[in-house]
């Protein structure tokens, strides 16, 4: 995509007030649920304000995020993500080590894309619940704690807060789908079972002109492979959502304190296509991309984001939820085989992070 003087309108993603929803009854509540249903069907995403993750916790998370990425390279390398990341999904990755893609399943094709596509100029820290028990092989986050005292305690706080909000999301899903047991999904979504995951992202500063011309990149277009994504942006911007009707990407501007709740691949499959897995990407802020402000060759400010993924328990089969027997509109990714949530996660993670052979690692 190139810079254009023609404005691109932001995605018409609705803003939902969760405090108001939880306090509502009767017809008012039915209308709120209808709006959520429509948003997840049409956009695959919704802004949420007045959620249960307090402003103080969110601001603290961004402080810790920046502190981590400001650490010396040697410290970050000490918790580098393992080569067999599909089995040990935790650790830091540097620029160019991962590649986001959509609908590409052939490892040879992924390697070709790595060589031909612009490098995603970002670092990431993949995090599992610090209270969980995992097979040997994960990086030891105590190595970070030695340089950032209090880091692990905050991670416990962060995961607990995000898990609580995720359960609220799942109860609303059950209510929209007409389930009697509003904890039906939550019972198959347990912490410390690799069902919760968080990614902290740092997008490097780079010339605006490179991003706008497509010669440089921040995050390729992709869907998320979870049930729900809870995304927290800083105020820099750059997130874009695919508009299927117009076949263009539209900006999703940050709203201070809000989170964006996106439908992932698993939930699209579980709702049998009723809701769409949100295809999205990260590029330059819209004021640079679409003619609002000439970026020139000035350095683009850095960007940080915090992401929390709710994932079905790994041993659960992926199949339609009760009430979703009738196929819906969406089929973002064709799945030929019935598989468990763990198999799906391993497949997507391996394509994003694992290299075909050790000799190809840059």
Swiss-Prot record:
Cystine pairings recorded for this chain: none
Full protein name: 2-oxoglutarate-dependent dioxygenase lolO2
One function term, GO molecular function aspect: dioxygenase activity
Keyword Metal-binding: yes
Organism placement in taxonomy: Eukaryota, Fungi, Dikarya, Ascomycota, Pezizomycotina
Residues noted as binding Fe cation in the record, renumbered to the chain: 222, 224, 280
Gene3D superfamilies attached to this UniProt entry: B-lactam Antibiotic, Isopenicillin N Synthase, Chain
Biochemical pathway: Alkaloid biosynthesis
Source organism of the structure: Epichloe uncinata
